[in-house]
């Protein structure tokens, strides 16, 4: 009996999504102008900015980040400060705030670039074969050795020593001696046969 399954290929799945959102905000945390680009996942940058401005600085935590991925998440601290209505929540790494001024704005450029492409191809082969094991079991029975049968009897009068011999410590008139030597000879023959078979 043979069973064979071949899977030569599966349909490939590919999709690409490209979206670019950018907005510029200003911050007055540091005294120098820095241009940076942050990537995040958000359906609407303007809606996210309004949501963040509507919250109290004490209520802003890591869960308000647009993404939990360290590479694309915002650097929002639990003690984030709000600078002004135009700047929104500060993304600067400094935890200390500085009085607002008209100089030294940090330029924040938020952009979203997302692309997904998935291609899967599977090549596999499964083969199962079975054979009958009855023939092997029959062959094993043919080579089975037949060893000489050893007969043993329960305690009878011929196997029990006389009471008179128990005091001497030696077997002078022992009815069991003849049976013992016959049994020992048979055991020796069985042992020799086993050694030859091995």
Curated annotation (Swiss-Prot):
One CC-aspect GO term: host cell cytoplasm
Phosphoserine: residues carrying this PTM: 67, 154, 156, 164, 166
The keyword Nucleotide-binding belongs to this UniProt entry's keyword annotation: yes
Keywords annotated in UniProt: Glycoprotein, Host cytoplasm, Magnesium, Metal-binding, Nucleotide-binding, Phosphoprotein, RNA-binding
Composition bias, Polar residues: 91-100
Post-translational modification: O-glycosylated.
Signal peptide residue numbers: none
Localization per Swiss-Prot or TrEMBL: Host cytoplasm
Acetylation is among the record's keywords: no
GO BP terms, alphabetized: viral genome replication
Pfam families listed in its UniProt record: Rota_NS26
Similarity field: Belongs to the rotavirus NSP5 family.
Protein name: Non-structural protein 5
Species of the source: Rotavirus A (strain RVA/Human/United States/DS-1/1976/G2P1B[4])
Lineage: Viruses, Riboviria, Orthornavirae, Duplornaviricota, Resentoviricetes
């Amino acid at each position: 009996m043979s069973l064979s399954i071949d899977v030569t290929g599966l349909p490939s799945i590919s999709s690409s999504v490209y979206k670019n959102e950018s907005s510029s905000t200003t911050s007055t945390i540091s005294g120098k102008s820095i241009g940076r680009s942050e990537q995040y996942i958000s359906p609407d940058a303007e809606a996210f900015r309004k949501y963040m401005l509507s919250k109290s600085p004490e209520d802003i935590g890591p869960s308000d980040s647009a993404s939990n991925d360290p590479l694309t998440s915002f650097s929002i601290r639990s003690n984030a400060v709000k600078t002004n209505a135009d700047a929104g929540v500060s993304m600067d790494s400094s935890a200390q705030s500085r009085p607002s001024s008209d100089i030294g704005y940090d330029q924040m450029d938020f952009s979203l670039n997302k692309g997904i492409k998935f291609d899967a191809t599977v090549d596999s082969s499964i083969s199962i074969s079975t054979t009958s094991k009855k023939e092997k079991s029959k062959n094993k029975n043919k080579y089975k050795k037949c060893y000489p049968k050893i007969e043993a009897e329960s305690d009878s009068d011929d196997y029990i020593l006389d009471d008179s011999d128990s005091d001497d410590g030696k077997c002078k008139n022992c009815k069991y001696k003849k049976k013992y030597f016959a049994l020992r000879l048979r055991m020796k023959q069985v042992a020799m046969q086993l050694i030859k078979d091995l």
